[in-house]
Structure formats: C-alpha cells, structure tokens
C-alpha cells in the first residue's frame, strides 16, 4: 500500500526527466527513531542546499519513506500528514522545493531489511515506480539516496542509474543481498549530491 502526501504534477507534454529519490529519516532529516509529531522533525545539515542544487541541475526531487509507525499503531495517517506539513514548511521557508512525498505505512515482518516483503515497502521499488508513472520520470537517469540498505536496494530494484548511501542515519542490521562494492557510501546528503552531480557532468559546489 502506497500513500502520497504531496504531488506537483508534471505537464503531460514534458519529456521524461531524471529524479533524485531521497529517504526521509536519517537522510533528509535527522534520525530520531519514530518521528510521531512535528516537533520531533529536524532537517539534516545540508538538506536545503542539496535540494536546491539538484533542482538547479534539472532533477525532480522526490521523498520516498517507509513509515511503519502507522502499521504498528503508533500514529495515524493524519498525524503523519502533520509531520509532512512541518517538513514542507521548513523546506519551503528556505526555497527548497520537492515534487512529492510517497510513503508506505506497512509494518515489516522480516528482520532482514534487504528482503523484498512487499513491492510497496523499500527495498521494494513500488514507491519509485509509482512516482515515475505519476511524475513522468526517467528511472534510468535517476538516483536514490538513503542511509539504509533498504533505501539503496530500492533504487537498484527500480532500475535507477545509481544509489548512494549516507552515514547520517541508523546502521542497518544485516548484510546486503548485492555486492557492497556496487554501492558508494559517503558522509551525508551534501556528499551524495556531489556524487550525483559529478556523475552527471555537473560541477560540484
């Protein structure tokens, strides 16, 4: 089950464009366990700068996040909407625009986060595939940035050009199902943005 908090539709005549998919907790925002209310949400250092740079380079920016707190009964979808309104407010205040937020409320039953239990929940590609369909995105030219193996594997499973892992979130509990050498790991979202822009021929800031 995939839900969407916001969506800025792309014009129907627009050519498919590349995107950077961002995990929320531990990547775009500081990792704080289950974020159940707006006051708990803090942007990760460099998030605003990174979004501005990516959009200036022609990328759509889409947040894709597993939110199992809903499936666990810890919060409602209305409460999550309040958290996402706070996220949008903080980003909008700094002129950092995102195109959409997709989330999966399902609760995992498998402890190994590299196993695809559901197409909708990362590491399944469902959120990325739905975003590509609704926003007219070119997955083959798109990237995934996240702190967990489930994030980067979602990018691989969706057929993205690349996935970059950041060290700002929670360390994953299990080894990847694919070679770790295939996944570049950097310190934070700023360094990950440098990787994406460098690979695409844009000069790093």
Question: What residue ranges belong to the model's regions?
Answer:
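Conserved Lys-Pro-Asp/Glu-containing loop-to-beta segment of HAD-superfamily phosphomonoesterases
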Residues: 119-152
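Basic, amphipathic juxtamembrane/active-site segments
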Residues: 32-49
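Substrate-recognition element of Asp-dependent hydrolases with the DxDx(T/V) motif
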Residues: 47, 51-90, 96-110, 155
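Non-catalytic pre-domain segments flanking phosphatase-related domains
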Residues: 1-22, 202-205
